[in-house]
């Protein structure tokens, strides 16, 4: 249905206005709910485009690379689907960032496709610990 319908065009980043001028880490994720969960629970700056299919303009890529020492791509782990679209789109985003970004993924053992699901399934403290462990690329 229309649950997540909005009038934003594909160039709008969710969470952009909350980003610091610079920082150690940035997480690019798939949805506003994950941006909010990451920012609230981990205090890690996070942003999301309107969909996993959208790619940022090269000027934005260069700006983010200059502002953040490490950029992580945390898209959905569609572990329960025949084709893991989140993994494929995450890999494409890493390539779009000229391999400056690192793709991380919530392990299948958690049965959680995204960070907000992980928080719901194992709790905020455990989810934050799991995220720290994820920053070693899979």
Tell what function each PLM region has:
Residues 1-67, 85:
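Phosphate-handling DNA/RNA-contact segment within nucleic-acid enzymes
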Residues 64-77:
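A structural-propensity feature for long, helix-poor, extended segments
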Residues 110-138:
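Short, small/acidic-rich helices and loops at N termini and domain boundaries
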Residues 26, 70-72, 102-103:
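A structural signal for isolated positions on well-ordered beta-strands in alpha/beta enzyme cores
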Residues 33, 53-56, 75-90, 108-110:
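Acidic, metal-coordinating catalytic cores used for nucleic-acid/nucleotide bond scission
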Residues 44-45, 91-104:
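Structural alpha-beta junctions
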């Amino acid at each position: 249905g229309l649950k997540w319908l909005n009038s934003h065009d594909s160039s709008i980043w969710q969470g952009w206005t909350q980003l610091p001028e610079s920082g150690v880490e940035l997480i690019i994720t798939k949805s506003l709910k994950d941006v909010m969960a990451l920012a609230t629970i981990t205090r890690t700056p996070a942003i999301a485009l309107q969909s996993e299919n959208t790619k940022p303009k090269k000027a934005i890529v260069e700006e983010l690379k200059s502002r953040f020492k490490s950029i992580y791509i945390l898209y959905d782990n569609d572990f329960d689907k025949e084709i893991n679209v989140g993994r494929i789109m995450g890999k494409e985003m890493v390539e779009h960032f000229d391999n400056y970004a690192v793709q991380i993924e919530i392990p299948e053992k958690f049965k959680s496709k995204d960070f907000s699901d992980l928080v719901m399934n194992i709790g905020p403290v455990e989810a934050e610990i799991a995220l720290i462990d994820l920053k070693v690329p899979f």
